[in-house]
A protein has these predicted regions:
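Membrane-embedded beta-strand positions in outer-membrane beta-barrel channels/transporters
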Residues: 69, 137-141, 185, 287, ...
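Periplasmic alpha-helical coiled-coil/stalk elements that build and connect Gram-negative outer-membrane
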Residues: 152, 168-286, 398, 402, ...
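Sec/SRP-type N-terminal targeting helices
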Residues: 80-81, 97, 146-174, 224, ...
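Short flexible linkers and secondary-structure junctions
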Residues: 23-182, 322-326, 344, 357-367, ...
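Terminal intrinsically disordered/low-complexity segments used for targeting and assembly
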Residues: 2-74, 121-123, 136, 160, ...
Length: 493
């Protein structure tokens, strides 16, 4: 028995294992680099810019915002859905990888037969004898397809790349949830400021209407001027319910992002909201490799790899496949002897070669489909990279513009406050009118309103830079490893 297990048949089997996996019909990997003709760095920005940590939103130094985003990351339903999709993709990757390994099955069987003995037609009815037989067997079966042309390997690699793309999709959803939550938060901060300022302006205009009515009664202004003041007052009054409605709608959107009902947000944003604006410029010369950390760019790159490997697998279907099989076990007439493998053992070895001769054009059509999908994904990846570059440059330019706009409005606020203070002193000293003071105070509130909106726009423009770069701009990743996999897949190598 021992000599049989060392026979040339098993040597041939070992050689077949070594030969399998030496070929691949997938196209060559695309040239390294994100896109041809792209500059090595983003030229926008200022040299004295400082970088942000991975949790870049902490630069706003707002614990309310930090808690809100932690809540969103833990309870957002879009993230829960994306996490489930990732688990499914990882499971599919393991399914596609299973074809690389031998299939081993074990079995236990028993059978019983009762038949007439030879020479009788009706057995016991005719007085003849009967033959009764019991058989018990155990088996261990082995089968393996040699991956000579790389079909199974390419299928496994395609599944793995799809799983990595799903992991990047999860990061894209995470970034989108953060961006939407931060946007809603700053919209709420600005809306509350606008409501407070609108209320102050209404009070000022109410006094202005009263003063105008007194002046009209004394013949100092015309009825047209009085109507204009009243109309202005009513217009501002009418804007207050609209602002309050917008605030409620934004709070409702934020509630959905954190997985809550809109009437259950007081503990998160019920108090004072005081985020600190970060006006640090974006550093100049950011390396173009930062685009590689964008989840959408990385995901489409992995889908391009998946399409490449899928094309290789479909090409391999044109060639013969070689499969090996072996089974061993025991067979006995009594259940107690079935595990007596030394006296009752059975061994079967087999090999099969299957070559496609005629498939009605199915194989060639599958190759053409895979080739078209590869070309399609190449275009998708190129478009994604170009779009990402355009979004980064636009976001950096917008951030610089919003910073300048905020500086101008801040200077204008200093002037408006000085004008209101001057009119207040003139009125107190009896050399100025109360109407002039009210007009100056209203102008100050209007500048404060514009400055509040500008502060929100600066924060959202900075958010736009982070989102366009896929997060922070401090950690420049290495060139992405197309075979890097989530931990759940790596653990099976």
């Amino acid at each position: 028995v021992t000599k049989q297990f060392r026979s040339p048949r098993f040597t041939l089997l070992a050689m077949a294992f070594a030969v399998s996996g030496c070929a691949s019909l997938a196209p060559d990997s695309p040239a390294p680099g994100i896109a041809a003709g792209m500059p090595p760095a983003f030229e926008q920005g200022e040299a004295d810019g400082r970088y942000q940590p991975a949790r870049w939103w902490t630069s706003f130094e707002d614990p309310v915002l930090d808690n809100l985003l932690d809540e969103a990351l833990s309870k957002n339903l879009d993230l829960a859905e994306a996490s489930a999709r990732l688990r499914a993709a990882e499971a599919r990757a393991r399914i596609s990888k299973s074809g690389l390994f031998p299939q081993i099955n074990a079995g236990l069987d028993s059978s019983y037969s009762d038949s007439p003995t030879a020479g009788t037609s009706f057995g016991a009815v005719a007085g003849g004898g009967r033959l009764q037989n019991e058989t018990y067997s155990s088996s261990l079966a082995f089968s393996y397809e040699l991956d000579i042309w790389g079909k199974l390997r390419n299928d496994a690699r395609a599944g793995r790349a799809d799983a990595i793309a799903s992991a990047a999709d999860l990061q894209a959803v995470r970034l989108a949830v953060l961006a939407e939550a931060i946007t809603s938060y700053f919209d709420i901060v600005d809306a509350r400021h606008q409501i407070a300022l609108t209320t102050r302006i209404i009070d000022v205009l109410g006094d202005r209407v009263e003063q105008s009515e007194n002046r009209y009664s004394r013949g100092l202004i015309t009825s047209f001027e009085l109507y204009q003041v009243r109309q202005d007052f009513r217009n501002v009054q009418a804007s207050l319910p609209q602002r309050e409605s917008q605030l409620a709608a934004t709070e409702g959107q934020l509630a959905v992002l954190v997985g809550r009902y809109a009437n259950n947000m007081d503990e998160l944003i019920g108090g004072s909201l005081t985020p600190k604006l970060d006006f640090a410029p974006v550093p100049s010369g950011l390396p173009i490799d930062l685009l590689a950390q964008r989840p959408d760019v990385f995901a489409e790159g992995q889908r391009l790899e998946s399409a490449r490997y899928n094309l290789g697998a479909r090409r391999a279907e044109r060639f013969p496949s070689l499969s090996l099989s072996a089974s061993t076990g025991s067979q006995a007439g009594a259940a107690s002897d079935v595990f007596d493998i030394f006296d009752n053992w059975v061994l079967n070895l087999g090999a099969g070669l299957t070559a496609p001769l005629f498939q009605g054009g199915r194989i060639q059509a599958n190759i053409e489909v895979a080739d078209a999908e590869y070309a399609q994904q190449t275009a998708v990846y190129a478009r994604t990279v170009l779009t990402a570059y355009q979004e980064v440059t636009t976001a950096i330019e917008r951030y610089e513009e919003e910073r300048q706009r905020y500086r101008f409005l801040f200077s204008q606020l200093d002037e408006a406050e000085a004008a209101a203070g001057l009119q207040s002193r003139r009125f107190a000293n009896g050399v100025g009118s109360y109407v002039d003071y009210l007009d100056a105070l209203r102008a100050q509130y209007q500048v404060e309103s514009s400055l509040s909106s500008a502060a929100r726009d600066v924060a959202l423009a900075r958010l736009g830079v982070h989102r366009a770069l896929g997060g922070s701009w401090d950690d420049v990743p290495q060139a992405p490893d197309i075979m890097a996999a989530p931990s759940a897949i790596q653990g099976e190598n």
